[in-house]
From Swiss-Prot:
Binds both single and double-stranded DNA. ATP binds at V128, T129, G130, G131, M132, N133, G134, V135, G136. Gene3D superfamilies: 3.30.230.10, 3.40.50.670, Histidine kinase-like ATPase, C-terminal domain. It comes from Enterobacteria phage T4 (Bacteriophage T4). This is DNA topoisomerase large subunit. Residues 369-400 bind DNA.
Length: 516
């Protein structure tokens, strides 16, 4: 029997039951990532990486809020399945806050143990932090078997201890002059398709810290005791040594090649927008608006934005973006209005467009892709036209009785309906057929097959003879100025002075030599 009932879950129950909404997949999956200078297929649990990122993001947010006067040193350590993130920030505000049940607890306790508690809910125009939903660090706590948060404001320290996904929690005040925040946790591997923080998680974390060091050069990052270096130009050139780099006050962008379709690596403030968003759309729209017309003028070929995009890799770091809009807690895509993005990043798209035109390594794959698409489209049109011709019935075709049978028949092409009347009187009905042309046949030299078949006479000739443009129907022989064609058993010898010319002014010889 199907139950018809309503359930009300607590925040923590909902997070555990629908974890994908908050931290992403808990399955061990294969994803393509760019790590240490090359694209790799990496197997890991995205949700587990999210737990580490949430704590790192909190420290980076403190640096952003204080314009890097504080939290300008962030240390990350991963050892024996235990993660520690420490910063030299101001510490989490320790003022007492009231919970929905009326209980008063210190601010750090609320931030680490209650979902939807935090200091980033103000959607004012000046907010530039990555945190926005108030669930980040509590998510890490919920999916940990051990979680210890320590924070100090220079006068007092608060230590919060939790275990088994916050089933057990306690806190204490300890007077002290230390200022900063330190979080240590061990993930609950029962919630994920893995049983350890293997080397791949260390590599992914180090790779992210290298990226953050590029985005925020004012922060000194260390990983397992070693300083992490950051330089945008060097970082971008890992993706493509020929990459075009442009650095503005609020945005750094690199445009390089991609042999396997469009690729991107983008950060907005400290958030990895792995599915891109409106900032990527803005950049591509503005670059293509200038680039596509120039390609058309220079190479006489039409190219679309989709064709340009599929040949490129974009590395884009946006800094100090105010009140950004992101999809869900996973924050994988930026959805801020286009106008806000354009006014903030101030990209010189025309210069990037000119640089692409002058960079053969990046430009030529775009041209080659456009040509390949054009040829494929033409071939498809030709095939369609040829198929149509093969099934067509030509009403003015006077058919030889043995046409299509095991006999050598001849098709006579006459100039006009009146001329074919003489043929009808003298022809051998068994072997001779005819078709009246309307004047001289179209000069089709240089035309595509699809365009040639738009001409009624050429279409009808192909329909009558079964010739398919582009396929060799006979063997061509050249002897001085004379050309010999063998067609259906008949040998026809012509030269350039014959009535049917070979230089392309008429079709019969010229086009047969070129196309058939």
């Amino acid at each position: 029997m199907i139950k018809n009932e309503i359930k009300i879950l607590s925040d923590i129950e909902h997070i555990k039951k629908r974890s994908g909404m908050y931290i992403g997949s808990s399955a061990n999956e294969t994803h393509e990532r760019f790590m240490f200078g090359k694209w790799e297929s990496v197997q890991y649990v995205p949700g587990l990486v999210k737990l580490i990122d949430e704590i790192i993001d909190n420290s980076v947010d403190e640096g952003i809020r204080t314009k890097f006067k504080f939290a300008n040193k962030i240390n990350v350590t991963i050892k024996n399945n235990q993660v520690t993130v420490e910063d030299n920030g101001r510490g989490i505000p320790q003022a007492m806050v009231k919970t929905p049940t009326g209980e008063e607890i210190p601010g750090p306790v609320a931030a680490w143990t209650i979902p939807k508690a935090g200091g980033n809910f103000g959607d004012d125009k000046e907010r530039v932090t990555g945190g926005m939903n108030g669930v980040g660090s509590s998510l890490t706590n919920i999916f940990s078997v051990m979680f210890v948060g320590e924070t100090g404001d220079g006068q007092n320290n608060i230590v919060v201890r939790c275990s088994n996904g916050m089933e057990n929690k306690s806190w204490e005040d300890i007077p002290g002059k230390w200022k900063g925040t330190r979080v240590t946790f061990i993930p609950d591997f029962m919630s994920f398709e893995t049983n350890e923080l293997s080397q791949v998680y260390l590599d992914i974390t180090l790779d992210r810290l290298q990226t953050l060091a590029v985005v925020y050069p004012d922060i000194q990052f260390t990983f397992n005791g070693k300083k992490v270096q950051g330089n945008f130009k060097k970082y971008a050139r890992q993706y493509d040594e020929h990459a075009i780099v442009q650095e503005q006050e609020n945005c750094s962008i690199a445009v390089g090649r991609s042999p396997d379709g469009f690729r991107q690596l983008t950060y907005v403030n400290n958030i990895h927008t792995k599915n891109g968003g409106h900032h990527i759309d803005c950049a591509m729209d503005d670059i293509c608006e200038d680039l596509i017309p120039q390609i058309k003028r220079k190479f006489k070929i039409d190219v679309t934005k989709a064709r340009v995009k599929e040949c490129l890799t974009i590395v884009m770091f946006v800094r100090d973006m105010k009140n950004m809009r992101l999809i869900r807690q996973t924050k994988e895509r930026l959805t801020s209005p286009f106008g806000e993005i354009r006014s903030h990043i101030q990209l010189d798209a025309k210069k990037i467009s000119r640089d692409i035109l002058n960079n053969e390594a990046i430009l030529m794959p775009i041209i080659e892709a456009a040509l390949a698409r054009k040829l494929a489209a033409e071939k498809a049109a030709e095939t369609k036209a040829a198929k149509k011709a093969s099934k067509a019935k030509v009403h003015k075709h006077i058919k030889a009785n043995l046409c299509g049978k095991d006999a050598d028949t001849t098709l006579f092409l006459t100039e006009g309906d009146s001329a074919i009347g003489y043929l009808i009187d003298v022809r051998d009905k068994e072997l001779h057929g005819g078709y009246p042309l309307r004047g001289k046949v179209l000069n089709s030299w240089g035309m595509s097959y699809a365009d040639m078949l738009k001409n009624k006479e050429l279409f009808d000739i192909c329909a009558i003879t079964g010739l398919v443009l582009g396929e060799k129907a006979f063997e061509e022989k050249e002897d001085g100025e004379w050309f010999t064609f063998e067609l259906n058993g008949d040998t026809i010898i012509v030269n350039e002075n014959d009535e049917v010319q070979i230089n392309g002014k008429w079709i019969t010889v010229g086009e047969l030599r070129k196309n058939l």
